[in-house]
């Protein structure tokens, strides 16, 4: 069981601020969590191999190769209207004025 004083100290360390009536609820909930952790600590798992994944599938890795990442030409291919050519040249989107 966590005392109210311990709950206040933990809350302060976690930079949490509680009302006075909430501290009791927090200490009860924190005590319950600590009880659950104690139950987990009692489990004997020394003969169990640790898991890195719940499935036995191996992740397919892509080849680590350098590729071109300049997508600006593809991005500006979608620009339409009178200013499309200028937008492609200066590599900026040209929009109507929104602030006067």
Curated annotation (Swiss-Prot):
Transmembrane segments: none
InterPro entries the UniProt entry points to: Asp/Glu-ADT_sf_sub_c, GatC
Keywords: ATP-binding, Ligase, Nucleotide-binding, Protein biosynthesis
Top-level taxon of the source organism: Bacteria
GO molecular function: asparaginyl-tRNA synthase (glutamine-hydrolyzing) activity; ATP binding; glutaminyl-tRNA synthase (glutamine-hydrolyzing) activity
Biological-process GO terms, alphabetical: regulation of translational fidelity; translation
Reactions this protein catalyses: L-glutamyl-tRNA(Gln) + L-glutamine + ATP + H2O = L-glutaminyl-tRNA(Gln) + L-glutamate + ADP + phosphate + H(+); L-aspartyl-tRNA(Asn) + L-glutamine + ATP + H2O = L-asparaginyl-tRNA(Asn) + L-glutamate + ADP + phosphate + 2 H(+)
Pfam families per UniProt: GatC
Record carries keyword rRNA-binding: no
E.C. number: 6.3.5.-
Residue ranges of coiled coil: none
Assembly description: Heterotrimer of A, B and C subunits.
Protein family: Belongs to the GatC family.
Function: Allows the formation of correctly charged Asn-tRNA(Asn) or Gln-tRNA(Gln) through the transamidation of misacylated Asp-tRNA(Asn) or Glu-tRNA(Gln) in organisms which lack either or both of asparaginyl-tRNA or glutaminyl-tRNA synthetases. The reaction takes place in the presence of glutamine and ATP through an activated phospho-Asp-tRNA(Asn) or phospho-Glu-tRNA(Gln).
This protein's name: Aspartyl/glutamyl-tRNA(Asn/Gln) amidotransferase subunit C
Record organism: Rickettsia akari (strain Hartford)
């Amino acid at each position: 069981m966590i005392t109210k004083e311990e709950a206040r100290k933990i809350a302060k360390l976690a930079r949490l601020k509680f009302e006075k009536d909430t501290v009791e609820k927090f200490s009860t909930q924190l005590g319950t969590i600590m009880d659950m952790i104690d139950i987990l600590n009692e489990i004997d798992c020394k003969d169990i191999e640790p898991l890195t994944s719940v499935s036995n599938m191996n992740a397919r890795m892509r080849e680590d190769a350098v590729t071109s990442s300049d997508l600006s030409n593809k991005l500006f291919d979608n620009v339409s209207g009178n200013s499309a050519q200028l937008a492609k040249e200066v590599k900026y989107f040209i929009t109507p004025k929104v602030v006067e």
